[in-house]
Curated annotation (Swiss-Prot):
GO biological processes: oxidative phosphorylation
Protein name: Cytochrome c oxidase subunit 6A, mitochondrial
Subcellular location per the Swiss-Prot or TrEMBL entry: Mitochondrion inner membrane
Top-level taxonomic group: Eukaryota
Mode of membrane association: Single-pass membrane protein
Function: Component of the cytochrome c oxidase, the last enzyme in the mitochondrial electron transport chain which drives oxidative phosphorylation. The respiratory chain contains 3 multisubunit complexes succinate dehydrogenase (complex II, CII), ubiquinol-cytochrome c oxidoreductase (cytochrome b-c1 complex, complex III, CIII) and cytochrome c oxidase (complex IV, CIV), that cooperate to transfer electrons derived from NADH and succinate to molecular oxygen, creating an electrochemical gradient over the inner membrane that drives transmembrane transport and the ATP synthase.
Quaternary structure, from the entry: Component of the cytochrome c oxidase (complex IV, CIV), a multisubunit enzyme composed of 14 subunits. The complex is composed of a catalytic core of 3 subunits MT-CO1, MT-CO2 and MT-CO3, encoded in the mitochondrial DNA, and 11 supernumerary subunits COX4I, COX5A, COX5B, COX6A, COX6B, COX6C, COX7A, COX7B, COX7C, COX8 and NDUFA4, which are encoded in the nuclear genome.
Length: 9
């Protein structure tokens, strides 16, 4: 699956 940019804010 295409993973979105993981941005843990």
């Amino acid at each position: 699956k295409e993973q979105p940019e993981f941005v843990p804010y």
